[in-house]
């Protein structure tokens, strides 16, 4: 990654951490910058996260793509990774953000078994 991009990421992360209520700022900054250096398709931004109980917080979100090797190929998978304000005590919350072009295949064992053993009329 070019130096200017790394410096920009560092200033964005530092700015978000200064405006937020992260408990362990240095650990967060170090781990986030390491992730951004390793996965160059990610970008830091501040984003509101709504928890299951309805509470919301402004968190650092790493958005973009990460390369995932599968059967000899590398696929860039779009993700959103929310770094909690309690990091490193609690793990980040990660989401895969499929694009409209991604093929979706769902395997539901109950439906499969039902169709295989369905009585024939």
What are these regions (language model features)?
Residues 2, 6-75:
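Strand-helix-loop interaction patch of compact alpha/beta domains
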Residues 56-117:
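Compact alpha/beta protein-protein interaction domains typified by the UBC
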